[in-house]
């Protein structure tokens, strides 16, 4: 049978998703957990090989196995740290998590201090539709034409969230779009300049750099006719452990925020 897992992970704890010799990676930890649980498997495939520092709430991996234990997320969760299996379902035998994906949804969390939010919202709409994103990606030989289906900008406290949905993305594409929007919000890049870059009018030496990977979250990967019901026990474990990390980090973050406000 073919089993697909919806997984979440804290990307700041890993050297990226893909296995690398002598480095801790998301893929490496999942494979280690499969081996330690005694689950025999083959044809391990993933939907997105996120970069170092990038986190996920809804990445998807799949294996072929005859072991029913694979359908219980807690079997692997008991052997995982910083990675959480939120759902495990049986899928068609030819399922490939990357090629079957209908769309991917990313969110970037950007401090809104000093940003003109309305300008960011205005410029963000320029990216909708089909464009050549060579100015907003790390070119690796692939076709640089992509289509963005949706882009939304909204605030959550002192954070500006930029959510982008598309069928596929180029390397560093989301982070470079975010950086361009940040520069717009700071008044250092205009909407007209972004429009020109999307039309190919730019110097390669002056491409927009990527925003830091730590602010990027792979929220979801959508499939036609395939749903991932969350496992109750897995969800409780995930929320408990992530809430504890949030409590630890929010104290330091708001301490620094208050220092700014007090002066």
Swiss-Prot record:
The active site is at 51 (nucleophile). Its EC number is 5.4.99.12. CDD domains: PseudoU_synth_TruA_Archea. It catalyses: uridine(38/39/40) in tRNA = pseudouridine(38/39/40) in tRNA. GO terms for molecular function: RNA binding; tRNA pseudouridine(38-40) synthase activity. InterPro entries: PsdUridine_synth_cat_dom_sf, PsdUridine_synth_TruA, PsdUridine_synth_TruA_a/b_dom, PsdUridine_synth_TruA_C, TruA/RsuA/RluB/E/F_N. Coiled coil: none annotated. It comes from the Archaea. GO terms for biological process: tRNA pseudouridine synthesis. It is an enzyme of class 5 (isomerase). Pfam families: PseudoU_synth_1. Keywords: Isomerase, tRNA processing. Substrate binds at residue 106. NCBIfam families: hisT_truA (TIGR00071). Belongs to the tRNA pseudouridine synthase TruA family. Formation of pseudouridine at positions 38, 39 and 40 in the anticodon stem and loop of transfer RNAs. This is tRNA pseudouridine synthase A. The lineage of its organism: Archaea, Methanobacteriati, Methanobacteriota, Thermococci, Thermococcales.
């Amino acid at each position: 049978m073919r089993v697909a897992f919806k997984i979440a992970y804290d990307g700041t704890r890993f050297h990226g998703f893909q296995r690398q010799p002598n480095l801790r990676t998301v893929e490496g930890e999942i494979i280690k957990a499969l081996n330690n649980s005694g689950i025999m498997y083959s044809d391990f495939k993933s939907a997105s090989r996120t970069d170092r520092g990038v986190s996920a709430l809804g990445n998807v991996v799949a294996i072929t196995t005859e072991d029913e234990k694979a359908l219980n997320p807690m079997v692997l969760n008991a052997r995982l740290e910083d990675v959480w299996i939120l759902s495990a379902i049986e899928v068609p035998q030819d399922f490939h998590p990357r090629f079957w994906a209908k769309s991917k949804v990313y969110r970037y969390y950007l401090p809104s201090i000093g940003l003109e939010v309305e300008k960011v919202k205005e410029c963000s709409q320029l990216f909708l539709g089909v464009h050549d994103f060579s100015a907003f990606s790390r070119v690796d030989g692939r076709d640089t034409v992509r289509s963005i289906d949706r882009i939304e900008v909204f605030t959550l406290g002192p954070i500006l969230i930029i959510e982008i949905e598309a069928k596929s993305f180029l390397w560093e594409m989301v982070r470079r779009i975010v950086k361009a929007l940040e520069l717009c919000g700071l008044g250092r890049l205009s909407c007209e300049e972004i429009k020109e870059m999307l039309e190919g009018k730019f110097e390669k030496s002056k491409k927009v750099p990527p925003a830091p990977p730590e602010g990027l979250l792979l929220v979801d990967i959508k499939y036609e006719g395939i749903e991932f019901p969350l496992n109750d026990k897995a969800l409780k474990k995930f929320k408990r452990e992530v809430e504890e990390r949030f409590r630890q980090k929010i104290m330091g973050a708001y301490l620094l925020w208050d220092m700014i406000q007090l002066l």
